[in-house]
């Protein structure tokens, strides 16, 4: 009798159960299935779960509201409040308004103000929808940046009561950040309506009343809304940057998002592209401000609440957390710089909990923690902040017992090297001399691996502290080719980039929008910065660059001038105080017969502009260059950068009033307002001798009278 065709075993049973479950899911109607948001794949939120990684417990904070899931991307859509969607007509209107603001073709500021008022009227009642909209949230950011304080005051009032949800939203969190930054200057002001504004309000029916709360009180309301959730918001991917801005605003510290070393916003943050000078407050956000007294007490309470819900282990784990680390940097800098370095003595302070032992003895818990931060790409940024702000006594212990003996190996490391830079900035003359002697033998290997930041900072600090740079100059000379022309190509990475471009063009065709590799661009930038720093040092270090520039042919100089990164070196060499008249007399004529080509180039035009002050004391060369520019007047006037060169060289004055142009070219009208010719050295000596003789004559007359 044949056996039944039956599969046996554990794997077969598991497969049968999966098939049954799959059939059940297919039979369920699609509408009854809960919809879930797509998980985020942002690389910035991925955490390397190594041996030193401690995950944050979801239920760690007892005060944390359980309705907010740690990963908002994986949470059901119903967990976050839904403020509604804009109608297609509304989306089209706000998209066109965004385009109008980007074009910025308003006749004057009054026309722009009227347009912004009309957009606010159209957005009345839809502010939360716009802030949470992917396409229109950028418009909200631009509106806030271009609004006056009264409009910001009203918008802030609309957001009150919703900040806990908005700061966690992918798009609305950026609107909150922009709102905090632009509202910060008004916390000490009382928003008063002018008579014209009051008349407009009386004429228009249905005008919304002015908010009863001041901006300072509104910031306190925001803190009250977020209270009890600080421990969770520290590591929330969207709320983190908004919390940083809020802390800095409460402290009255500068909130400069555009700075390269800013911890306020991510480097991937999209720029709004606002025209220069179109914001209401200009660069107020980059300045320190006075704040109400209640802000300082509120800030202290926030910092206390943040660290009270975390024990020492989790606080140190936050130091290597990619989202929580920038917030910790802000907290440490505020604790040490805003409240004073004496606050670090408090055993409950953040700094003391991170670094309890200031002696940094080998094998201690503090030394192990600091060593882990040194080589961690995320943690090293916190260590930079600690080194920059920590008290002098603690810094001396860190340097003498931990960093001094291994500063050479730390400088070679690509991550720890940045901490070494912060250490060099705080060293005194004797310690800097000792560090220079240790690092100088490693300079050739550092430059070979494109680690140019350490030699650059060494030069800067030696100039500040008055340390002899001759050993560093010899090390730099040994690191590069003996041929001066080749030396400059190696420093600026011109030779390597040319070879890379040739190899890439042979291997694969480039698209029209293909960009150069990030590594080569970074190397060129650091090489240019190193060369510019070398030019500021008097003596043999700057001589290495000057001799290399004189060894270049005119064609290679034109090529360097048209390079956006390398052209900065030429501008510096023409205008820096170490540039002698003898060098400029030999160097400036190399650009003649190439001025048209350079003036029409976006980078080369800046070199032509630098030739104007560089030839102040060699008038015959400047006059020859002006004649060459005159021959290509039409080509220069047809170009945007060419018109800038024509204006900076005062060529209209050259054509019409040659005598006045000559006085301006020699720098005579810049020395004094009367337009008098500056005295020569022999004339100054004669005047000094005459004044001394007159003084002696007066003294002799006085003696005769007394006798």
UniProtKB/Swiss-Prot annotation:
Residues 1-27 have a biased composition (Basic and acidic residues). GO terms for molecular function: RNA binding. Pfam families: PUF_NOP9. Its main location: nucleus. One of its GO terms (biological process) is endonucleolytic cleavage to generate mature 5'-end of SSU-rRNA from (SSU-rRNA, 5.8S rRNA, LSU-rRNA). It is found in: Nucleus, Nucleolus. The keyword rRNA processing applies. Residues 1-77, 268-287, 497-523 are annotated as: Disordered. Pumilio repeats lie at residues 122-157, 158-193, 365-400, 401-437, 548-588, 590-627. SUPFAM superfamilies: ARM repeat. Residues 57-66 have a biased composition (Low complexity). Keywords: Nucleus, Repeat, Ribosome biogenesis, rRNA processing. GO terms for cellular component: 90S preribosome; nucleolus; preribosome, small subunit precursor. RNA-binding nucleolar protein required for pre-rRNA processing. Involved in production of 18S rRNA and assembly of small ribosomal subunit. Belongs to the NOP9 family. This is Nucleolar protein 9. It comes from Aspergillus flavus (strain ATCC 200026 / FGSC A1120 / IAM 13836 / NRRL 3357 / JCM 12722 / SRRC 167). The gene is nop9.
């Amino acid at each position: 009798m044949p056996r039944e065709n039956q599969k046996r075993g554990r794997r077969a049973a598991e497969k049968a159960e999966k098939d049954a479950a799959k059939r059940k899911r297919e039979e369920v109607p699609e509408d009854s299935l809960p919809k879930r948001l797509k998980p985020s794949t942002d690389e910035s939120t991925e955490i390397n779960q190594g041996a030193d990684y401690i995950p944050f417990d979801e239920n760690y904070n007892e005060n944390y509201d359980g309705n907010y899931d740690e990963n908002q991307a994986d949470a059901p859509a119903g967990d976050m409040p839904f403020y509604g969607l804009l109608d297609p007509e509304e989306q089209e209107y706000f998209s066109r308004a965004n385009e109008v603001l980007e074009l910025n073709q308003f006749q004057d500021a009054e026309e722009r103000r009227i347009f912004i008022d009309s957009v606010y009227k159209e957005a009345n009642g839809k502010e939360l929808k716009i802030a949470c909209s992917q396409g229109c949230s950028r418009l909200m950011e631009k509106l806030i940046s271009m609004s006056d304080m009264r409009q910001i005051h009203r918008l802030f009032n609309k957001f009150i009561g919703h900040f806990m949800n908005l700061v966690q939203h992918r798009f609305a969190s950026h609107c909150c950040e922009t709102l905090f930054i632009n509202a910060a200057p008004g916390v000490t002001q009382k928003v008063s309506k002018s008579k014209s504004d009051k008349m407009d309000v009386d004429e228009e029916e249905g005008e919304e009343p002015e908010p009863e709360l001041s901006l300072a009180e509104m910031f306190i309301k925001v803190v009250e809304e977020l209270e009890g959730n600080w421990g969770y918001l520290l590591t929330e991917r969207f709320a983190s940057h908004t919390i940083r801005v809020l802390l800095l605003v409460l402290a009255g510290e500068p909130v400069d998002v555009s700075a390269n070393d800013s911890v306020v916003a991510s480097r991937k943050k999209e720029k709004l592209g606002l025209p220069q000078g179109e914001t209401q407050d200009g660069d107020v956000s980059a300045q320190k401000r006075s704040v109400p007294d209640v802000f300082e007490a509120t800030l202290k309470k926030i910092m206390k609440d943040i660290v009270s819900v975390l024990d020492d282990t989790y606080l140190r784990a936050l130091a290597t957390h990619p989202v929580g680390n920038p917030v910790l940097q802000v907290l440490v800098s505020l604790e040490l710089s805003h409240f004073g370095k004496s606050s670090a003595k408090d055993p409950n302070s953040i700094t003391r909990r991170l670094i309890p032992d200031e002696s940094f003895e080998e094998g201690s818990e503090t030394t192990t923690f600091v060593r882990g931060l040194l080589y961690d790409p995320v943690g090293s940024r916190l260590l930079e902040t600690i080194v920059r702000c920590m008290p002098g006594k603690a810094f001396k212990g860190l340097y003498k017992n931990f960093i001094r003996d291994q500063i050479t190996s730390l400088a070679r490391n690509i991550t720890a090297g940045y901490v070494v830079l912060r250490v060099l900035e705080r060293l005194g003359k004797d310690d800097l001399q000792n560090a220079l002697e240790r690092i100088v033998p490693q300079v050739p290997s550092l430059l070979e691996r494109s680690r140019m930041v350490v030699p650059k900072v060494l030069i800067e600090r030696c100039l500040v502290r008055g340390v002899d740079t001759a050993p560093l100059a010899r090390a730099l000379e040994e690191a590069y080719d003996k041929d001066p022309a080749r030396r400059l190509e190696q420093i600026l990475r011109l030779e390597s980039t040319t070879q890379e471009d040739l190899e890439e063009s042979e291997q694969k065709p480039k698209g029209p929008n293909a960009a150069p590799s990030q590594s080569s661009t970074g190397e060129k930038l650091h090489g240019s910065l190193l060369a510019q720093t070398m030019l500021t040092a008097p003596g043999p270090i700057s001589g290495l660059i000057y001799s290399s520039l004189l060894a270049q042919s005119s064609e290679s100089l034109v090529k360097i001038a048209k390079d956006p990164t390398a052209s900065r070196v030429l501008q510096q060499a023409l205008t820096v105080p170490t540039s002698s008249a003898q060098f400029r007399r030999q160097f400036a004529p190399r650009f003649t017969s190439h001025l048209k080509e350079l003036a029409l180039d976006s980078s080369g035009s800046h070199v032509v502009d630098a030739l104007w002050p560089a030839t102040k004391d060699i008038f015959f060369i400047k006059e020859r260059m002006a004649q060459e520019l005159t021959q290509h007047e039409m080509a220069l006037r047809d170009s945007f950068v060419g018109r800038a060169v024509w204006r900076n060289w005062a060529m209209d004055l050259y054509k019409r009033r040659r005598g006045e142009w000559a006085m301006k070219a020699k720098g005579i009208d810049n020395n004094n307002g009367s337009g008098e010719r500056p005295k020569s050295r022999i004339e100054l000596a004669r005047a000094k001798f005459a004044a001394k003789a007159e003084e002696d004559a007066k003294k002799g007359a006085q003696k005769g009278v007394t006798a």
